[in-house]
């Protein structure tokens, strides 16, 4: 399981960014937005491979931004909190676990994919031209607690 998680969550994003980055570097501009996680900043419980892959994502974002910012690329990330998707269905369907998670989220609700529209558009736009190596959390306030 460890290898599969690292392959999907870290290696695939690195390989894709390397390939896309080649063209962007030739053109002298581009924006890469990585998918991080709350576990980019926290250790998590029972998910060491996932936590390690997302912790490494933070370092990858910073390393690539250090290399490519001066060449016209912006490298940033989005860190989703607890979002109502297929991946979180079991958590949402467990009343006790869901209550404990929602109690920690200041907005008191699960996020939705629509919650990413603004942050992703911002990072993809010229409004973020001076941002590099940053990760925006979209978590209903989870990390503020």
Features from the language model and the residues they span:
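Substrate-binding pocket helix/loop in short-chain dehydrogenase/reductase
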Residues: 1-6, 101
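Active-site helix of classical SDR
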Residues: 17, 53
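Residue(s) in the substrate-gating loop at a strand-loop-helix junction
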Residues: 37
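Short C-terminal tail/terminal secondary-structure segment
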Residues: 42, 120-121, 132-145
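Active-site loop-to-helix junction immediately N-terminal to the catalytic Tyr of the SDR YXXXK motif
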Residues: 42-51, 63
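Short, small/polar-rich loop/turn modules that mediate ligand/substrate recognition or access, typified
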Residues: 69, 74, 131-133
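A conserved structural motif in NAD(P)-dependent oxidoreductases
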Residues: 105-116, 127
């Amino acid at each position: 399981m460890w290898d599969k998680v690292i392959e999907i969550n870290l290696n695939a994003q690195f390989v894709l960014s390397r390939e896309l980055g080649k063209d962007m570097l030739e053109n002298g501009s581009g924006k890469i937005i990585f998918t991080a996680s709350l576990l980019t900043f926290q250790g998590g419980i029972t998910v060491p491979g996932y936590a390690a892959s997302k912790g490494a994502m933070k370092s990858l974002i910073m390393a690539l931004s250090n290399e490519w910012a001066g060449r016209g690329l912006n490298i940033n990330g989005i860190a989703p909190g607890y979002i109502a998707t297929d991946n979180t269905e079991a958590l949402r369907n467990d009343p006790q676990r869901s209550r404990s998670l929602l109690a920690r989220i200041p907005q008191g609700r699960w996020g939705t994919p629509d919650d990413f529209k603004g942050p992703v558009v911002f990072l993809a736009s010229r409004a973020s031209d001076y941002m590099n190596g940053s990760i925006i959390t979209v978590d209903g306030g989870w990390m503020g607690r």
